[in-house]
Amino acid sequence: MTFEFFPIALKRSLRAAALALAIGAGFALSVGLSGPGGKAVAANDGFSDGQKDQIESIIKAYLLKNPELMLEVQRVLDQKQEAARQEASGKALAANAASLFKNTSMPYGGDQKGDVTVVEFFDYNCIHCRDAVEPIGKLIDADKKVHVTFVDFPIFGKDSEGAARVAIAAGKQGKYWELHRDLLLHKGSNCEDAADKLADKLGLDIAKLKMDANSPETTKLLKDNSALAGKLGINGTPHFIVDNKVIPGAPEDLYDQLASMIGDVRKNGCKVC
């Protein structure tokens, strides 16, 4: 991290910060700053422009001598911003809990009536979504009571949307998870044609598949998914949700994190799901 922003950002707020610190501490200008005639000026009497400049210079010099304080300030700011983000996320999850955890129109993997639901927003051409497919498959195989809701969220253009439509249609023939998995394990770009070929290998009825892929119902689902992502502030993939907790991206320990969250819900109950 560099401090190139210091002259601009700090100069704007340094005077106010210095005054706030001085007044908050309740000290007079006995540190060498004095009013006319050598009389100390009380903090609540205010400061002259010259005195303000002196205070600013003292604080600026101290910060330049101890730049690590700026890192500490940034750390505290990051913590506050993260706390605010989590609070906003929690409220958004609670407000949209029914759409996330009780929506039977969305395709799924695992137990249809599972006791805990994992929600994944993803795109078939998302590199990190490919990284997540094996941990999700492992979770479905290992935990026979988990329900994984797949929210098709094609943010990478028409090819992604075409693949998503075919996958959703495959769900009408009971093969959503199989095609979903095959698409994300498939080498190369995913599109409608690639999805059709993989669906054919799975023995699906291609004529019915194409009809369902382009149905008003599928179009509505994709629009609803996009709207839901917007309400939750999700603009990237993959994004996982378990109750009121989220995992953005696909960390190396994704399986362990999800298993821990699921265990927590089973032990302590749902907060929003």
Language model: regions and residue ranges:
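N-terminal targeting signals for export/organelle localization
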Residues: 2-96
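C-terminal cap of thioredoxin/glutaredoxin-like
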Residues: 2-7, 39-56, 60, 200-273
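Domain-level signature for proteins that mediate thiol-based redox and metal-cofactor handling
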Residues: 31-32, 119, 147, 242
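Soluble non-cytosolic domains of exported or imported proteins
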Residues: 49-53, 64, 116, 127-130, ...
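A mature extracytoplasmic/lumenal domain signature
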Residues: 75, 122, 152-154, 213, ...
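Short amphipathic alpha-helical segments at helix boundaries and their inter-helical linkers
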Residues: 81-88, 192-195, 217-230
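A short beta-strand-turn-helix
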Residues: 98-116, 140-141
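Structural alpha/beta surface segment adjacent to cysteine/selenocysteine redox centers
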Residues: 119, 124, 130-201, 205, ...
